[in-house]
């Protein structure tokens, strides 16, 4: 469907018909490969080698089909068909796992289609949206017209704008992250 696709990390297993499918929903902001960084650093591959059949929703880059999509459209036109495909593998409900913002999308999917979801796992999913204070709210309100203008011009928010918004939410986050990377032994397993 559009730029989105469902990646099956258990399709090559000899026992794929017996492996338990789990539909993974990443954030719309991060690419799906955050859950499959490399052959040695991959949650999807590790789960596949340990008896599960991970199905990863890859949003791709928004194309013409996705221009103007809101969250409802991503849930109804992308996630619901992915859930249907996952259910075809088992003939019944499946586990759905959401990562970061994908957890909110997975939760919405589970609420819309409870008969299709056996279990729900939420990983690093934001849940507190009221603790940012009045200063953040006022600034976001003031930025609204500019963001609307960018959406009208590009049809989506450019990734640099999204990154700036995330950085703005915690200005020290980026410098702390790179300071920690710089302090690591570059040959250590953690640095991989």
Each language-model region and where it sits:
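Short, surface-exposed "cap/lid" segments of acyl-processing enzymes
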Residues: 1-63
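A structural boundary/capping signal
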Residues: 14-15, 82, 87, 110
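Conserved catalytic-core motifs of eukaryotic protein kinase domains, centered on the activation segment
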Residues: 66-68, 133
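Alpha/beta-hydrolase active-site loop
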Residues: 68-88
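Short helix-loop-beta connector
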Residues: 90-93
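Alpha/beta-hydrolase-fold enzymes
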Residues: 105-192
């Amino acid at each position: 469907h559009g730029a989105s696709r469902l990646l099956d990390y258990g399709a090559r297993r000899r026992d794929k018909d017996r492996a338990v499918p789990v539909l993974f929903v990443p954030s719309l902001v991060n690419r799906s490969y955050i859950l499959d960084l490399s052959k040695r650093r991959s949650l999807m591959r590790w789960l596949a080698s340990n008896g599960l059949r991970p199905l990863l929703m890859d949003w791709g880059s928004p194309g013409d089909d996705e221009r103007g999509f809101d969250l409802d459209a991503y849930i109804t036109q992308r996630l619901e068909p992915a859930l249907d495909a996952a259910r075809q593998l088992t003939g019944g409900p499946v586990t759905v796992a959401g990562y970061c913002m994908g957890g909110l999308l997975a939760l919405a999917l589970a609420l819309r289609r409870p008969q299709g979801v056996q279990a729900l796992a939420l990983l690093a999913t934001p849940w507190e949206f009221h603790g940012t204070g009045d200063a953040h709210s006022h600034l976001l309100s003031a930025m609204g017209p500019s963001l609307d203008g960018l959406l009208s011009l590009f049809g989506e928010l450019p990734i640099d704008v999204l990154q700036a918004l995330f950085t703005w939410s915690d200005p020290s986050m980026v410098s702390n992250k790179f300071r920690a990377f710089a302090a690591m032994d570059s040959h250590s397993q953690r640095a991989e």
